[in-house]
Amino acid sequence: MNKLITIVVPIFNEEEIIGKTSSRLIETADGWEEDYEIIFVNDGSIDQSKNKILQFIKQNKKKNFNTKIKLISYAKNVGKGYAIKKGIFISKSKWILTCDLDMSVLPGQYLIWKKRKLIKDTNCAYIASRTHKNSKIRSKFIRRRLGGILKLILFNFFSLKVSDTQCGFKVFHSSYIKKIFNKIRCYDYAFDVEAILLMNKSNIKIIELPVSWVHRSGSKVHLIKDSVKFFLDLLILKRRLSR
């Protein structure tokens, strides 16, 4: 494996923020000591997201970043989980970091974890937890309230003790993560939950780490509507796993 870390970034209709957040991502990663690659995965966007990323890659060729930035794109929107799976499967790195393009968690969070030696065991998954006692969160009360309700649902449905499954900032090791995502069948709202359940079954330890998280304006998440869809996905997942 040539790269030490791959950053997988799923994209769906993000044309308005691609330029700003992509530049922030690569500027931060270029300051890391280890080698890296960034894989953008365009999950069937119907806006100009694909062209914006291609333009970004072209602009950065002058800075010798072209070998470190890749774009995977396909026409049909399948879901965030599928996009992350596609990125993971072409990764050539020891470690894989997934993060959202809106930069609710800044990529420098990974470096903070590394400096504190919180990431070391290859048989663990490291998940940013907005409920961790040392996390610094800037969000509305209703989001925090819904997070607490979700925690209760996950425990009652799956006996899952992970307090925050949905933060997109996660670090996995290549020794297990491709096998895990090869088994995933839920590609939409509940894919994180299914991945964590599969990791538990495979004796992969889930470690929740503190994070600085800010709700960004322009986010594509519709709180109430997406919460309902997420709950329905959990019902489908529970029924499938109960067979």
List each model region and its residues.
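Hydrophobic/aromatic residues located in beta-strands of well-ordered beta-sheets
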Residues: 38, 71, 125-126, 206
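Hydrophobic helical membrane-anchoring modules
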Residues: 1-5, 16, 20, 152, ...
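Acceptor/aglycone-binding surface of glycosyltransferases and processive sugar-polymer synthases
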Residues: 74-90, 95-98, 107-189, 215-232, ...
